[in-house]
């Protein structure tokens, strides 16, 4: 294999569900805080709370939502793009064979997003 395509798609249900769960987690953290300093402390360890969430959707996709918010991105389309990029990062980080193939120029990885309404494929560059 010389080319690996990580293809996401418009209106992704996993992204939508993760956004709901992320927003609920954030709301619960800030609503239970008695003041703004406590709220800031609660949000400061948000990555740990996502990593230890009961929901597999939040554990797997929630980091993409969190990263997008950290970059001040707010749309589902942007969340989808960030999740594609994060998926590529995870593949490279956790696969020694992919790392070796990339290092020796035997493999290219491309991120893309299929637009359901138009049938077009948006190629993403990272």
Q: Where are the regions a protein language model picked out?
A:
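Divalent-metal-activated hydrolytic enzyme cores
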Residues: 1-3, 12-126
């Amino acid at each position: 294999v010389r080319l690996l395509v990580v293809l996401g798609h418009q209106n992704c249900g996993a992204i939508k569900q993760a956004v709901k769960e992320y927003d609920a987690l954030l709301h619960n953290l800030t609503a239970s805080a008695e003041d703004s300093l406590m709220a800031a402390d609660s949000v400061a360890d948000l990555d740990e709370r996502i990593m230890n969430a009961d929901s597999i959707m939040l554990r797997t996709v929630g980091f993409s939502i969190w990263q997008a918010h950290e970059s001040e991105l707010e749309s589902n389309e942007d969340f989808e793009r960030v999740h594609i990029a994060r998926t590529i990062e995870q593949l490279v980080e956790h696969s020694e064979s992919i790392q070796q193939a990339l290092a020796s120029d035997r493999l290219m990885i491309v991120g893309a997003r299929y637009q359901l309404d138009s049938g077009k494929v948006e190629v993403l560059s990272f």
